[in-house]
Amino acid sequence: MALKKRTVVSPAAGAVSLPSLMADLPGTRRLEEVPLDKLSPAPADWNFYAPLPDDKLLELIESIRANDLLHPIVVWKQPDGALVILSGHNRVRAYTALLEKTGEDKYRRIPATVLTDITADEAHEIVVDSNYVQRVLTPSEKARSISQKYALAGRKKRSRNGVRKSKYEQIGEEYNLSARQIARYVRLGSLDGS
């Protein structure tokens, strides 16, 4: 599968924003409010990232209470109607905590970009890319992210000028890293068992 060309840069490297990443989402999408109790997390092997520490989660809760949710979560609607969280696990945790603490009905549903007509590989890529954009990753998380991105990437493809690019070069352009750095992260990620 050939991945869609986009630039994805981590916060440590001067991030592309989450909204700009979300503007390039594949598939059919619509914005709606979805019930918290209908959401399920992405598979653990896709979403291996540590949850926010308690102090950062409290900051998120207070921000949502004061300003509402600034960025909708992203969910993948399965053919059976199940909703899998692709981006926003911590926002769902914050909404759940607010519902438990306040009992207010407005926290029973959360704004979401609902995606349909996407593949499992595209869904997996959204989990990896959104976490890469939003967080300062540990070295092992970064290696595992890049290793998974590499596994999802297609074979060599031609660039606009007709030159073939390796998967390392393709991902390096997206993540603002050299092909050599990508190769190193892929090797490190494979040591981690991803």
How would you describe each model-predicted region?
Residues D68, T116, V186:
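Short, small-residue-rich loop/turn micro-motifs
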Residues A2-T113, H124-V136:
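Short, charged/polar connector segments at secondary-structure boundaries
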Residues V133-S194:
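Alpha-helical interaction elements
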Residues M1-A2, G162:
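Short, low-complexity interaction segments enriched in Ser/Thr/Pro/Gly
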Residues I118-E122:
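A short acidic, often aromatic-flanked loop/helix-cap motif at beta-alpha or helix-coil junctions
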